[in-house]
Amino acid sequence: MRLLHLDSSILTDTSVSRRLTAQVVQDLHAAIDDLHATYRDLAAAPIAHLSGAIAAGFRPLPQPDSDAASVAEHALSEQLVDEFLASDIVVIGAPMYNFSVPTQLKAWIDRIAQPGRTFRYTANGPEGLAGGKQLIVASSRGGMYAQGPMASLDFQEAYLTATFGFLGVRDVYFVRAENQSRGPGPAAAALISAQASIADVVRSVARGVVHTRVEA
């Protein structure tokens, strides 16, 4: 069983999303035997944003006259897609930045959203090719966006749900810590609530993994 763990917060010791993903991964290891993890820190080791040259290298393979940089970027794109497709569980730390996801996470998504690899177009419309995965997103936000007057500005969780759904990933769980910029009291209460929700999420994911194993 393979786990892909991604962090994208530009913060380190003070990052709420990193604290949450660390606890999620720890609890997953305790709940699921033989869980092999691959970790990427998308902020510490950022992936280059999509360019014309990088996109041209998705498919087919780079031409013989491609420069070394293009060949290297193609190899990285292939590695990122392979890691994603090979994973049974994906854990993503995704704080809200300016109502959306960190640019570092968007760069990774742009590499793995490849026609013919993770989705395809058919006569009946687009079809995701990355189904069967369990996705857990550790979501941290400065204010309250799950409900209330700011809900319409949520282009973070809504974007992730839509994007991974397009790729075929239907089982998406959010561990959400809101109000992180609303003072120590509300921030601490929201973090405690998010941490308390992890146990239920891990149980649900573990059940899904067992169900997948039985079907296989």
From Swiss-Prot:
GO terms for molecular function: electron transfer activity; FMN binding; oxidoreductase activity, acting on NAD(P)H as acceptor; oxidoreductase activity, acting on NAD(P)H, quinone or similar compound as acceptor. FMN binds at residues 9, 15-17, 96-99, 140-143. Binds 1 FMN per subunit. InterPro entries: Flavodoxin_fold, Flavoprotein-like_sf, FMN-dep_NADH:Q_OxRdtase_AzoR1, NADH:quinone_OxRdtase_FMN_depd. Its cofactor is FMN. Keywords: Flavoprotein, FMN, NAD, Oxidoreductase. Its EC number is 1.6.5.-, 1.7.1.17. The keyword Ribonucleoprotein does not apply. It comes from the Bacteria. It catalyses: 2 a quinone + NADH + H(+) = 2 a 1,4-benzosemiquinone + NAD(+); N,N-dimethyl-1,4-phenylenediamine + anthranilate + 2 NAD(+) = 2-(4-dimethylaminophenyl)diazenylbenzoate + 2 NADH + 2 H(+). SUPFAM superfamilies: Flavoproteins. Pfam families: Flavodoxin_2. Quinone reductase that provides resistance to thiol-specific stress caused by electrophilic quinones. Also exhibits azoreductase activity. Catalyzes the reductive cleavage of the azo bond in aromatic azo compounds to the corresponding amines. Belongs to the azoreductase type 1 family. Homodimer. This is FMN-dependent NADH:quinone oxidoreductase 2. It comes from Xanthomonas axonopodis pv. citri (strain 306). The gene is azoR2.
